[in-house]
Regions:
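Short, small/polar-rich motifs associated with maturation and membrane association
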Residues: 2-272, 279-280, 342-343, 449, ...
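Proline-centered turn/helix-capping motifs that create local helix->coil transitions or kinks
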Residues: 28-29, 64, 432-442, 469
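Outer-membrane beta-barrel strand-turn architecture
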Residues: 144, 221-224, 258-260, 349-353, ...
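Surface-exposed loop/interface segments of Gram-negative outer-membrane beta-barrel transport/assembly proteins
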Residues: 147-198, 239-243, 249-342, 360-463
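Surface-exposed interaction regions that form or flank ligand-binding interfaces
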Residues: 357
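Exposed, low-structure sequence patches enriched in small/polar residues
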Residues: 362, 465-473
Length: 473
């Protein structure tokens, strides 16, 4: 027999009428001509989200988040359709509340502040941003306050605690198996005779890592001015000892309207402070290959090795041998401190008497400061490298400042005439990119060990852009 299927099209119609964010404006989903996908908060990944990238993993076809080195706060590399170049930059353009930002890290954005991701994939969708969008565009819209008729603030808190550990160590010889293998090659020189210890070096470098994440937001309205204020605190230990990541986030959003709602204003300010204590991932390889019959700690004449076992030959450290991985973890003092603020003020004016025409002005900034340091004391095992400064410790400092500013002004005309709908947009954009960095490496007494580095650059981007959309029912 035959079957008749009757479908209710109401839901599909509602989806087509849904408004989505695109470059320099919003359109109904049914009028979109390019390839884009919007991911909303209830569609994002749940549970632990240390960075904004975590919320997007596996949610958009063709978007891959390539994991970092596994350390807390390392984030991931975003690729849309896996990029297009073997040698050039494959990073997509990231736009946060109308402000294009660097894709080096979007950790300045608290995942709990994100209202939606819009991913623009193909040329027709990304063309409005020019050549810098050749690898796609990700538009991040943050949460706003809502004028729901009440001035009472509402509070929201969420937090979590995590426990992480290494599920399985690399399979290596036990101390007994190592001794048996060594006995089969008993002609080894005296320098490499076995020790008397029994050390599992992987257990010495790993730990059970604890993490906490707390987020508090307040939403409300003051005399019909919606606002949202949020703060967040994240502290995550790495499974490698001495590895830690700490982040403090804060954001403020105001959305007042004036002149009988003809002028809409959006003010967004976001800030973050990140303190990252990285460790060398090379200690993992050292722990796998290090002699399990050697102790973690041992004293030598002249305090060589600072109390940690060090490979020695005739009373001198062997420069070509792997350094004690525990010493590398505990003696290297590393800190990467990042302060960042992203903000903008956007004006949307609906012309009196000609309300199909709107003028938009967006002024924004992205300011970032990085201060990195690495201190290793004299006589540390890793400082014996066979050069003229053998055993000399080091002091490394790096400072970078970035200041990016922008101004966008565009007009948007949107008109519906019976079955016809036309949207015309045209505008002008100005951006300034400036950065300065310097670094210096000295010994523990301040003597330079390398030539100090300094760089400074200033770039400008001027653009004229436009778009015409026409649809007929």
């Amino acid at each position: 027999g035959s079957e008749m299927c009757i479908r209710d099209r109401q839901e599909d119609s509602e989806l087509l009428d849904e408004v989505v964010v695109i470059g320099y404006g919003q359109v109904k989903k049914g009028d979109v001509t390019g390839s884009l996908l919007t991911v909303k908060p209830d569609e994002l990944n749940k549970g632990k989200q240390l960075t904004a990238e975590d919320a997007l993993v596996g949610k958009v076809a063709g978007v891959n988040i390539v994991p970092g080195n596994g350390a807390p706060g390392s984030g991931g590399t975003i690729r849309i359709r896996m990029g297009a170049s073997l040698s050039a930059d494959n990073d997509p353009l990231i736009v946060i509340d109308g402000v294009p930002v660097s894709n080096t890290s979007i950790s300045a954005i608290n995942p709990n502040d994100i209202a939606s991701f819009t991913v623009l994939k193909d040329a027709s969708a990304t063309a409005i941003y020019g050549s810098r969008a050749a690898n796609g565009v990700i538009i991040i819209t943050t949460k706003k306050g809502s004028a729901d008729g009440t001035s009472r603030p509402s509070f929201n808190y969420n937090g979590n605690m995590t426990v992480s550990n290494v599920y399985q160590y690399m399979d290596v010889l036990s101390t007994e198996e190592f001794r048996q293998a060594f006995a089969e090659h008993a002609n080894a020189p005296e320098t490499f005779k076995l020790g008397n210890a029994d050390v599992d070096w992987q257990k010495e470098i790993y730990r059970v890592a604890l993490g906490t994440d707390h987020n508090l937001s307040m939403t409300g309205a003051l005399k019909n001015m919606p606002y949202r204020v949020s703060v967040g605190y994240t502290n995550q230990n790495g499974t490698l000892k001495n590895n830690n990541y700490e982040r403090i986030n804060a954001s403020v959003g105001l959305s007042p309207k004036f002149f009988d709602k003809h002028l809409s204003v959006d003010i967004n300010v976001k800030g973050s402070i990140e303190n990252n204590q990285p460790v060398s991932t090379g200690v993992i390889g050292s722990a796998i290959s290090f002699d399990p019959t050697r102790p973690v700690y041992e004293d030598y004449e002249g305090n060589v090795g600072l109390g940690y076992y060090t490979w020695m030959n005739s009373g001198k450290p062997i420069t070509l041998a792997a350094a004690n991985p525990v010493a590398d973890l505990e003696l290297a003092d590393k800190l990467e401190k990042t302060k960042r603020s992203i903000g903008n003020i956007a004006l949307d004016y609906k012309v009196h008497g000609l309300e199909d025409l709107r003028f938009n002005l967006n002024m924004g900034y992205d300011i970032q400061k990085n201060d990195n340091r690495e201190n290793v004391p004299d006589l540390a095992p890793s400082m014996y490298t066979g050069n003229q400064n053998d055993g000399t410790g080091k002091r490394y400092k790096y400072h970078q400042t970035k200041r990016n500013t922008l101004l966008d002004f565009y007009a948007n005309y949107d008109k519906e005439l019976k079955d016809h709908h036309i949207n015309v947009m045209g505008g002008y954009g100005w951006q300034r990119f400036w950065y300065k960095n310097n670094s210096v490496t000295t010994d523990t007494e301040g003597k330079e060990l390398a030539t100090p580095q300094h760089a400074e650059a200033e770039l400008y981007l001027l653009s004229f852009y436009g778009r015409v959309n026409y649809s007929w029912k």
